[in-house]
């Protein structure tokens, strides 16, 4: 099978790594990719938001499956263009991707499907914002209605900060604060059938102890030793299947990866948000534990044959990923700094630990930083303690001037 992956982050590196290990994959391509993906896939320069260009590239390569990684191309309808050319594509239509592209749309779908979520108001002017903030009280939760690379949400006790964030957006969703730990659960769907993956937990704040501003994610781990063993089945029945059914009822079936961001509250499971693609950095730990070949799973979803797929197989091992970010992230990051220690990790820590590239590029023989989140250092182990130790041992080998990372990823879950 010839596969083309669209994107260039650590999520896409994780996807490409798993696909490169799949014996059914005979040729692997990625556009635009990054310095790490270049080691496992042939790279192509293309505008990931240009559906016609992506479709032309897929046709030229003879791709039998196209996997669209990031949210922006999905919302822009890239999967539609590929699908219209008769090429199987893993990723929802632009209309279905509105589940992520518009939080107000997602709230409407959840209301119609009876999916449990936070009470909320959609606000388009300061008066509506003030009324909503007063209705719910602190902590205030204000979400940009559109895409914001994981940084469009403000949770604060400061009403002025909440107002300022709302006023900087065209339309916001103001909602009640949900207590309890957060869980990310991915499900592969062909628009009718749902296959859940294993749950993970990510760390959204920039600093240890969940302090600092929100980011795209600073680390993740799986499995969740503290979670109810029935959690996945419960979420499939109360959240994922009803949402997929409602999207199909609306005439916009959702095919691809449906990501439910959940809060395990004192009143039960509540949906915080939906995403229309694999999450980053959770994908790094979930795929590290998936034993079922990835290409067949994605192809089954892309072609409507998920019901025929055998049950997914999982490793009993734990996985931890730690994100190494540039100086000043999540503000404007410093880029162009050389990265050292990558060969050392490959020589001394493989196969239990490895580095997935995000914001990197090749510059001569060197690899340099090219974005905010630069690397995802991922490790597996018999339990979270071993996986965590291996991940941080590998992180310590990496040199990047001014870089930052959290030191407490999976610490509480591992009992550290």
UniProtKB/Swiss-Prot annotation:
Location of the ATP-grasp domain: 107-303
Enzyme kind, highest EC tier: ligase
Domain of life, per lineage: Bacteria
Binding positions for Mg(2+) per the UniProt entry: 273, 275
A GO BP annotation: purine nucleobase biosynthetic process
Keywords: ATP-binding, Ligase, Magnesium, Manganese, Metal-binding, Nucleotide-binding, Purine biosynthesis
Annotated residues for binding of ATP: 133-184
Cofactor(s) it depends on: Mg(2+); Mn(2+)
Homology family: Belongs to the GARS family.
Name by which UniProt lists this protein: Phosphoribosylamine--glycine ligase
Species annotation: Streptomyces coelicolor (strain ATCC BAA-471 / A3(2) / M145)
The encoding gene: purD
